[in-house]
A protein has these predicted regions:
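Conserved ABC transporter NBD signature motif
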Residues: 5, 37-48, 52-53
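The feature captures the beta-strand-to-loop junction immediately N-terminal to the Walker
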Residues: 11-16
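Helix N-cap at the start of a conserved alpha-helix in ABC-type nucleotide-binding domains
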Residues: 19, 141-143
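Helix-to-loop junction immediately C-terminal to a conserved catalytic motif
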Residues: 29
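ABC-family P-loop ATPase nucleotide-binding domains
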Residues: 61-117
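Catalytic Walker B motif of ABC-type/P-loop ATPase nucleotide-binding domains
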Residues: 130-134
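Helical segment within the ABC ATPase nucleotide-binding domain
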Residues: 145-157
Length: 232
């Protein structure tokens, strides 16, 4: 499996459930051990410079409920001790921007506010790479649209790149610069979004006008695999 994310870009990871999106992200972070290969982040071998690299990475996994009974202020006090480049002024800026109440317990936040809080933590140590696993899962359309807008602003204003896995392909239609399609644990295609969309024109039907959406590409690609399996 091989793909590359450039500076100040958003890459979307797509693939059906079980394809390997979350495992890929966990492998990058050394949360699971890959059987072979290597991960380079900031042009350094992650296995050799993990501690240094993690100072420059922010992670947001959807559905995380760590310290659910603790107030945000307490979680922040613990978190900031792990980062040498923690910026309290930056943290307060994002707490205010995201309208977060530090006196609230983590479990009292909505799913959207939980993601915003995790983003605030990540951006407060000036992360240059955000790794997001299904961050918009379970959110209503308005909250999802707001987060996508935030992602675009982060990349533009914070000298940051985003690696973003999701099964909601319409989110990536709106915000991704690059797309990586994972199928059965392998990269089927990884390219800039326009190049990616054009590379699947062979899946178009006579009645189709314009390029296929990411959802249509996934459905037709996976359907083709089902047909191949049925024919065996």
């Amino acid at each position: 499996m091989s793909f590359c994310l450039g500076s100040q870009r958003i890459m979307g990871l797509i693939g059906k459930n079980g394809a390997g999106k979350s495992t890929t992200l966990k492998s990058i972070l050394n949360m699971v051990s890959p059987e072979s290969g290597s991960v380079k982040i900031f042009q350094k071998d992650f296995s050799q410079y993990e501690k240094e690299c993690k100072q420059r990475i922010g992670v947001v996994f959807g559905g995380i409920d760590f310290y659910p009974l603790k107030k945000l202020s307490v979680i922040t006090a613990v978190t900031q001790k792990f980062y040498t480049d923690w910026d309290q002024e930056q943290y307060q800026k994002y707490i205010k921007r995201f309208a977060l109440d530090e006196s609230k317990k983590f479990k009292e936040l909505s799913n959207g506010m939980k993601v915003k809080y995790l983003l605030a933590l990540a951006l407060s140590h000036h992360a240059e790479l955000l790794i997001l696993d299904e961050p918009t899962s379970g959110l209503d359309p308005v909250s999802r649209e707001e987060l996508l807008h935030i992602f675009r602003q982060i990349v533009k204003n914070e000298n940051c790149s985003i690696l973003f896995s999701t099964h909601i392909t319409s989110d990536l239609d709106k915000c991704a610069d690059d797309i990586t399609y994972i199928q059965n644990g392998c990269v089927l295609k990884s390219a800039g979004k326009d190049t990616f969309l054009h590379s699947f024109e062979h899946l178009k039907m006579p009645e189709d006008t314009g390029l296929l959406t990411l959802e249509e590409i996934m459905l037709r690609t996976e359907r083709s695999e089902w047909d191949d399996d049925a024919a065996v």
